[in-house]
């Protein structure tokens, strides 16, 4: 718990005691006291609506109640500088800013751990994201999902949740058969033999390369073997080739997974039919028209869903149910699935299946990744200049850089359509959000280097009481909000709140820097305090950028 949180608790307790004295309630009768940070600093550091909450109990107007509470609030509290009543009965608090300087040694000590909390209390979450078919390159939707999923996992972990990242490999569907047939055709082609290319095959350059690899590895060994034997071998090689590309691209994007879960393993380990039997035992399966159905309408789905078709083949829904049952049986409290925009209609049926299995539907959360449109110089970009095909994640990283790609994808809520401005992402100006934040970090690093060259090291023993200007206090207030912002971003599943915070922090630092001289050799004690202050800003900027998978450069 940091200084800001401790003072919030002290303030809430002080308000409670004031209510007891002014209104005549027992402590247990006082409703929950909520503190809000006013958007306009003119309205104080904190505000509470407790007087409005008490109106019915006290049988008085909220403002009249507030007027009775305020005198009690002003008694014996060094934390509060001023209290005022606003509007119909809001109580605004102006705190004595001197307490803020206690933050500096705390942040310096916690360093990379600054921002961590036990807010999540170790609750076990699994976040499954990206999960692209292993049949080609990652597109922009996958890239946005990767950035948001990884950032969310980082944020929730810092907020005290136990988080596992998982990639579901769709390696059991018809698309894999097409991949194998495509690889087979390119294998024959690489050996100079005629082969009919499958109608729905994959024609990318990567499959041509795979065919050459197979020819180099096996020669003509599989030319005359049975189709079954050849395709069984090529299936393993093709999947290894494609998943290897996915892993490499994601690792370059600074995204890693704790588990790569194969759909095929559900069949190999007999996980599918037991899931069906559990649904049957729970009374939600019926047979109709030769097919096997799940009665999802019992759980607010708009129609029942087929699990096994009349020809005996499974729909996609059945293995998906088995997979989610497997996740829950692994002990996760909550599952977060991050899906593409085209899966929005899939949510009600999957939540229904979770409930039909005997779990709470609230144990499944789904975050939808909306579409991404690229723009450059105001013109929409649909094709890669390099390949003449759809722009891939790899293309975008090469064009605007890894940091800009990660940061820009985290800037907007995942459920909003995104226009990605490539020109802005490449610009080296303060209009570029990621440049603006990284430049603040680099500028601080430069000042600290200059101080070190003059024999001035950052120390926790500096006299922090010398930090007294409004810009210093404003910067400290923003620094003190970091852990709360992380917890809020975790709770709301909203990485974009970290982006917003970093922009606010960079702005606060730049305002401080423009109005306060840091390196003043004629005033060494103030200089030492300000060096310590900007070091805390550097630490917090770095920690926030790290959550988003973005680097914190020392020089720019």
UniProtKB/Swiss-Prot annotation:
Enzyme Commission code:
6.1.1.19
- Could you tell me what reaction this enzyme catalyses? tRNA(Arg) + L-arginine + ATP = L-arginyl-tRNA(Arg) + AMP + diphosphate
For this chain the motif 'HIGH' region maps to: 132-142
Cellular location of this protein? Cytoplasm
Matching PROSITE patterns: AA_TRNA_LIGASE_I (PS00178)
Q: Which GO terms describe its cellular component?
A: cytoplasm
Disulfide bridge partners, by residue number: none
Q: Which InterPro entries match?
A: aa-tRNA-synth_I_CS (IPR001412), Arg-tRNA-ligase (IPR001278), Arg-tRNA-synth_N (IPR005148), Arg-tRNA-synth_N_sf (IPR036695), ArgRS_core (IPR035684), DALR_anticod-bd (IPR008909), Rossmann-like_a/b/a_fold (IPR014729), tRNAsynth_Ia_anticodon-bd (IPR009080)
GO MF annotation: an example: arginine-tRNA ligase activity
Task: Read off the SMART domains from this record.
Answer: Arg_tRNA_synt_N, DALR_1
This protein's UniProt keywords:
Aminoacyl-tRNA synthetase, ATP-binding, Cytoplasm, Ligase, Nucleotide-binding, Protein biosynthesis
Q: Which domain of life is it from?
A: Bacteria
Per the UniProt entry, what is one GO biological process? Answer: arginyl-tRNA aminoacylation
Locate the coiled-coil region(s) and give their ranges: none
Q: Which PANTHER family match?
A: ARGININE--TRNA LIGASE, CYTOPLASMIC (PTHR11956:SF5), ARGINYL-TRNA SYNTHETASE (PTHR11956)
**Assembly behavior:** Monomer.
Describe the family membership recorded for this protein in Swiss-Prot or TrEMBL: Belongs to the class-I aminoacyl-tRNA synthetase family.
Name of the featured protein: Arginine--tRNA ligase
| Organism, scientific name | Listeria monocytogenes serotype 4b (strain F2365)
